[in-house]
């Protein structure tokens, strides 16, 4: 009966965090609008080989993540939940692997359930796992690869070892098809310390080639298909998206070596109090094979991405699966022997919630700021934000009431965030970061437009997805579409600022021309170097400018 209650509680937890509130949040640009539109175009065109964005070749990532996203929109429709369904599914599958792996290591159902709940409630996992990017997919394949390798190395027969390594190769191949060759580097780096300390080189060298073969066979069909369709794909993807992105001096998203320290700290909420003890206990028990494996799984990718010049928080998502298992194991030990860390965790959550309440007041219309984040007419959003932090502090306090028994309720600290964050976003943020909000405000003007031009790729993708059209023209800036715009068949999909007046004269009689520009909040739109318009509709950071036929 207790197991049934636990399962019901887990399903309710998943529903409240990962299912019910997802549709209430508008898509963010540039990431979510980009991936939503790529998948929409894949469904509309039926081309499941070459990814396109706004009808242009888009070679920043391989194809597998777009497949999953497209299936999500196919099943649930072109809506907010449909766009995010794929990443939610991947996150829940990763949580299932955490459950399975914890059970395999410790044979403890309660520990497995706690590890799963901790993983799903970690701030970084929840933030990325409900956000339509490709990182939850690659995290799933990396976690599946680590589970497969352990399965292979623990097998007692050659059939079991062979099956494990073949499965490892498939997961690595799918990882390559999701986000590239890092799906090969990260698992190798993660297992090497364990292989070295356990002296398991023989099995690795005897059976490792099976993983190589299955990885190649997994990638080969699509790899050959896209090479035939687009011969330049692999050169661009390998050199620009791997070497330049991570290693060269002009790498994207450059950050210092210590970049991931605050990411780990913030990402570990609401379980931050367990982080030091989990790592220390893991190190102290390093003679235990499973503990070494989890430590290596956590630390090696972190070091690898810290050394790389290009960094983003999403890169280390897979590390939190092993970290959740270490935290759950340590938490049960602490609850049994010395609950000091659990008390500290409760106070950290109280402090975080109270700090959030104070910060919300400071940036509210009733605070001391001259330009508050929320305006007076958005008072309900302020109360939503207060509720988010109040619930965080409340559950932090509740875990202290009988800490040996109530500490797991820290998983409910982000409940207010999950349910209310979509209702608390300030209008000034929505107007710049949520193209759907802009489209809703200007739908009647946008719909009949013959041509739509914009100076932001993220906004362009949002307009294309909302209006179900991929012919949005880039104005003045190419952004990440620079490569696709270089192809001869992309002629006419970009108009520079200097050419706009002539372009307008040539196309004005064909129908309404709409220009959507991103501007600074205090920028005077009358100073823009554009021909006089027939209509202007400013929505704070986005401006709709229209030219009608004459």
Swiss-Prot record:
It is found in: Cell inner membrane. Pathway: Lipopolysaccharide metabolism; 4-amino-4-deoxy-beta-L-arabinose-lipid A biosynthesis. It catalyses: 4-amino-4-deoxy-alpha-L-arabinopyranosyl di-trans,octa-cis-undecaprenyl phosphate + lipid IVA = lipid IIA + di-trans,octa-cis-undecaprenyl phosphate. Coiled coil: none annotated. Catalyzes the transfer of the L-Ara4N moiety of the glycolipid undecaprenyl phosphate-alpha-L-Ara4N to lipid A. The modified arabinose is attached to lipid A and is required for resistance to polymyxin and cationic antimicrobial peptides. The chain crosses the membrane at residues 7-27, 81-101, 111-133, 137-154, 165-185, 204-224, 255-275, 288-308, 315-335, 346-366, 382-402, 406-426. It is an enzyme of class 2 (transferase). Its EC number is 2.4.2.43. Belongs to the glycosyltransferase 83 family. InterPro entries: ArnT_tfrase, Glyco_trans_39/83, LipidA_mod_glycosyltrf_83. Keywords: Cell inner membrane, Cell membrane, Glycosyltransferase, Lipid A biosynthesis, Lipid biosynthesis, Lipid metabolism, Lipopolysaccharide biosynthesis, Membrane, Transferase, Transmembrane, Transmembrane helix. It comes from Escherichia coli O9:H4 (strain HS). One of its GO terms (cellular component) is plasma membrane. It is a multi-pass membrane protein. GO terms for molecular function: 4-amino-4-deoxy-L-arabinose transferase activity; mannosyltransferase activity. GO terms for biological process: lipid A biosynthetic process; lipopolysaccharide biosynthetic process; protein O-linked glycosylation; response to iron(III) ion. This is Undecaprenyl phosphate-alpha-4-amino-4-deoxy-L-arabinose arabinosyl transferase. It holds the Pfam family PMT. Its main location: membrane.
């Amino acid at each position: 009966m207790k197991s049934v209650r636990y399962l019901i509680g887990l399903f309710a937890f998943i529903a409240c965090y990962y299912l019910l509130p997802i549709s209430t949040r508008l898509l963010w640009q540039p990431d979510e609008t980009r991936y939503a539109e790529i998948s929409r175009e894949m469904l509309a065109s039926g081309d499941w080989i070459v990814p396109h964005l706004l009808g242009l070749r888009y070679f920043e990532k391989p194809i597998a993540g777009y497949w999953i996203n497209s299936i999500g929109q196919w099943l649930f429709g072109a809506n907010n939940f449909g766009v995010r369904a794929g990443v939610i599914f991947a996150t829940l599958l990763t949580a299932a692997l955490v459950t399975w792996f914890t059970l395999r290591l410790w044979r403890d159902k309660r520990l497995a359930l706690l590890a799963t709940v901790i993983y799903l409630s970690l701030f970084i996992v929840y933030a990325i796992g409900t956000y339509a990017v490709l990182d939850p997919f690659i995290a799933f394949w990396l976690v599946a690869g680590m589970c497969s390798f352990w399965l292979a190395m623990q097998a007692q027969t050659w059939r079991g070892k062979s099956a494990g390594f073949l499965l490892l190769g498939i997961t690595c191949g799918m990882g390559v098809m999701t986000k590239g060759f890092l799906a090969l580097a990260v698992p190798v780096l993660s297992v090497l310390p364990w292989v070295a300390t356990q002296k398991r080189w023989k099995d690795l060298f005897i059976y490792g080639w099976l993983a190589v073969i299955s990885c190649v066979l997994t990638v080969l069909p699509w790899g050959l298909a896209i090479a035939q369709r687009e011969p330049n794909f692999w050169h661009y993807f390998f050199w620009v998206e791997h070497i330049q992105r991570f290693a060269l001096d002009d790498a994207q998203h450059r950050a210092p070596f210590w970049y991931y320290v605050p990411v780990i700290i913030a990402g570990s909420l609401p379980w931050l109090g367990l982080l030091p003890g989990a790592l220390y206990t893991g190190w102290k028990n390093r003679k235990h094979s499973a503990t070494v494996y989890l430590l290596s799984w956590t630390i090696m990718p972190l070091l690898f991405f810290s050394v790389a010049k290009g960094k983003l928080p999403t890169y280390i998502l897979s590390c939190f699966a092993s970290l959740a298992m270490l935290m759950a194991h340590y938490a049960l030990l602490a609850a049994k022997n010395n609950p000091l860390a659990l008390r500290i965790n409760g106070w950290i959550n109280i402090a975080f919630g109270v700090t959030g309440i104070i910060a919300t007041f400071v940036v509210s219309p009733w605070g001391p700021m001259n330009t508050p984040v929320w305006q007076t007419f958005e008072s309900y959003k302020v109360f939503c934000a207060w509720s988010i932090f109040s619930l965080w502090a409340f559950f932090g306090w509740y875990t202290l009431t009988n800490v040996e028994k109530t500490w797991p309720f820290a998983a409910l600290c982000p409940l207010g965030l999950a349910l209310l964050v979509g209702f608390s976003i300030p209008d000034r943020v929505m107007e710049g970061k949520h193209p759907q909000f802009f489209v809703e405000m200007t739908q009647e003007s946008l719909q009949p437009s013959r041509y739509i031009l914009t100076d932001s790729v993220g906004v362009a993708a949002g307009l294309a997805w909302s209006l179900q059209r991929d012919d949005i023209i880039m104005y003045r800036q190419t952004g990440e579409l620079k490569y696709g715009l270089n192809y001869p068949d992309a002629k006419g999909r970009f108009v520079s600022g200097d050419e706009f007046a002539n372009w307008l004269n040539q196309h004005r009689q064909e129908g309404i021309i709409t220009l959507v520009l991103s501007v600074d909040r205090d920028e005077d739109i009358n100073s823009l170097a554009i021909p006089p318009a027939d209509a202007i509709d400013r929505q704070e950071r986005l401006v709709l400018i229209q030219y009608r036929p004459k």
